[in-house]
Amino acid sequence: MTRFFQLVFVTLMLMLPAAAIAGPAEDANAAIDRWSAAFNTNDPETIAKNYCSDAILLGTVSPVISEGTQAIIKYFTPTKGTGNKNAIDERRTIIINDSAVVVTGFYTFTRMVEGKAMPGPSRFTMLVTKRGNEWCIAHHHSSPHVLPKN
């Protein structure tokens, strides 16, 4: 009977999907997906929770560097209650080590102006780090994605 249970156990273990075991790339991208969902709430405090406490943000529409939680909240305060949205269009991932991952790509911010949706293509680079058991954004650079005119 013991042999039977061993066989059942091994069979069940082999049936588990490999995707259930996430690595640094998956964890970092999940953190960025949480950031995007938080941005879509238009709540600065919710957005800021996705950043490390000592994070640096070079925001799309800011002439200054935002450093630390309070500065990041201040940066996102103008989005509060606006209905602005973010959608990640494309990304690439570079694993630095088991606790640091760089993700770069394109996203689109859609802001509401007089009830009309105005898309703003942008590009980003984020350094996502594991602090303790949590992944957070340590560095975030965002800028408009302006296509060259022919």
Language model segments and positions:
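A solvent-exposed, acidic/Ser-Thr-rich amphipathic alpha-helical stretch
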Residues: A25-A31, P44-S99, M118-P119
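Outer-membrane beta-barrel domain signature
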Residues: V113-G115
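A short hydrophobic beta-strand element
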Residues: S99-F109
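A short, structured loop/turn motif at beta-sheet edges
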Residues: T93-V101, V128-E134
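Short beta-strand segments enriched in hydrophobic/aromatic residues
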Residues: Y51, Y107-F109, H141-S142
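Short, low-complexity N-terminal intrinsically disordered segments enriched in polar/charged residues
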Residues: T2-S53, C136, K149-N150
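Short hydrophobic/aromatic-rich beta-strand segments that constitute the beta-sheet cores
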Residues: L57, V102-V103, I137
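Short beta-strand edge/turn micro-motifs at domain boundaries
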Residues: P121-P148
